[in-house]
Amino acid sequence: MTKLVIHLVSDSSVQTAKYAANSAIAQFTSVKPKLYHWPMIRNLELLNEVLSKIEYKRGIVLYTIADQELRKALTKFCYELKIPCISVIGKIIKEMSVFSGIEIEKEQNYNYKFDKTYFDTLNAIDYAIRHDDGQMLNELSEADIILIGPSRTSKTPTSVFLAYNGLKAANIPYVYNCPFPDFIEKDIDQLVVGLVINPNRLIEIREARLNLLQINENKSYTDFNIVQKECLEVRKICDQRNWPVIDVSTRSIEETAALIMRIYYNKKNKYNK
């Protein structure tokens, strides 16, 4: 079998590039591919990190990047290394422009519907909904990512955002003085990520939630000492098992998900420098 290294670089989820790569690979019976995923590459700092990885593990580069500056930097780098650098839809866009006489817009908006990626995304969204808030723990083995954290640390919206990028994410709440599921005692292949937040900020979010629901009796839910202990305990659980922890105090859902995706694909890529 001929080994073939393929780097998938994208400013979104790499699902389009991945689908194109797998479709092409299917035409070869004697190829053993190794795919490296580099999602959410949206600035030069992130791109430069990826370029160093590409130089270390040289192979074909497939990309879907809208930003012109990033595209130029990527293609120039690959040209200097003398490795193929292929825009997954660049040729299609160019031919459509020539045929129609319509100029290509500076910033392209990629929309892909009803392909394998689309249905994979639907399955991931369905999984995220069914495995929200600690439900159906017997199916955690099907997850790509498992999020743990105190209540109201954006686990659910982050799971859904990951699902929109084709990743199956389950989330499990940590509640002070309540037994945590025994899955943490097992060796698991899934990426487990702890989400924590500044206790004062978390109390504000919880108080707003209680006011919205017109609930005034749950004192422990907004007690500073308990909230602080919940966050500290999640950190402790993760530190003991070498699971990454993300502080979401100042991060948007998209930023949190992007960081999780980078951790996930870095783990999957398994670089050993």
UniProtKB/Swiss-Prot annotation:
Coiled coil: none annotated. It holds the Pfam family Kinase-PPPase. InterPro entries: Kinase-pyrophosphorylase, P-loop_NTPase, PPDK_reg. Keywords: Kinase, Nucleotide-binding, Serine/threonine-protein kinase, Transferase. Gene3D superfamilies: P-loop containing nucleotide triphosphate hydrolases (3.40.50.300). It comes from the Bacteria. It catalyses: N(tele)-phospho-L-histidyl/L-threonyl-[pyruvate, phosphate dikinase] + ADP = N(tele)-phospho-L-histidyl/O-phospho-L-threonyl-[pyruvate, phosphate dikinase] + AMP + H(+); N(tele)-phospho-L-histidyl/O-phospho-L-threonyl-[pyruvate, phosphate dikinase] + phosphate + H(+) = N(tele)-phospho-L-histidyl/L-threonyl-[pyruvate, phosphate dikinase] + diphosphate. This is Putative pyruvate, phosphate dikinase regulatory protein. It is an enzyme of class 2 (transferase). ADP binds at residues 149-156. Bifunctional serine/threonine kinase and phosphorylase involved in the regulation of the pyruvate, phosphate dikinase (PPDK) by catalyzing its phosphorylation/dephosphorylation. The keyword Nucleotide-binding applies.
